[in-house]
A protein has these predicted regions:
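Small/polar-rich, solvent-exposed N-terminal microdomains that initiate assembly or binding
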Residues: 1-60, 98-103
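Mid-chain, well-packed structural core segment of small domains
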Residues: 71-97
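Acidic-leaning, charged glycine-interspersed low-complexity segments
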Residues: 93-139
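Short, well-ordered turn and helix-capping elements at secondary-structure junctions
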Residues: 52-57, 78, 114-119
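Short, solvent-exposed beta-strand/turn "edge" segments of beta-rich domains on protein surfaces
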Residues: 59-65, 120-125
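Oligomerization/assembly interface segments of phage tail-like spikes and tubes
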Residues: 64-78, 126-136
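Short, cysteine-centered beta-strand-loop-beta hairpins and adjacent loop/turn segments enriched
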Residues: 57-60, 78-79, 137-139
């Protein structure tokens, strides 16, 4: 089943990001796997959210799994891109090639696909959308 490990993969990604000292030094505890409450103020500085995910089957004759393309988004209230890019680099350092443990499956690979830096309007002045690909195999 191609989406069977989606929740477990998201949990492992979140755990890896929140456990990384370099990333936490940049954003503190401002790492979210759910949308921020509507109407609430954005955290000042930078924060990270887990974004959208698209899953496609990755099945062979002997096994089944999924290709998970997912976004991690860096948000910033700063005027320039510098701080947001530092956070994006830290996110990449955590995830690219990571060996995340999955109880119900095996992470075959985790790689970076692309990033897009955008200017926004106050209060979110900068945003970097990072896309990653995880290939997982059910066990």
């Amino acid at each position: 089943m191609s989406v069977a490990l989606s929740g477990e993969l998201q949990g492992a990604i979140y755990a890896a990001l929140t456990a990384d000292a370099a990333l936490v030094a940049l954003v503190g505890s401002e790492i979210y796997d759910a949308p921020l409450p509507s109407g609430g103020a954005l955290p000042l500085g930078e924060h990270v959210t887990l974004g959208e995910e698209e899953v496609k089957p990755f099945d062979t004759i002997t096994s089944s799994g999924g290709i998970h393309n997912f976004d991690v988004v860096v948000h910033s209230t700063a005027n320039g891109f510098g701080a947001a890019k530092d956070v994006a680099a830290a996110v990449g350092a955590v995830l690219i090639g990571a060996n995340l443990a999955l109880v119900g499956g095996h992470l075959v690979s985790l790689r970076f696909l692309k990033a897009k830096a955008k200017r926004g309007v106050a209060p979110e002045l900068r945003r970097i959308e990072m896309r990653f690909r995880a290939v997982v195999e059910d066990i």
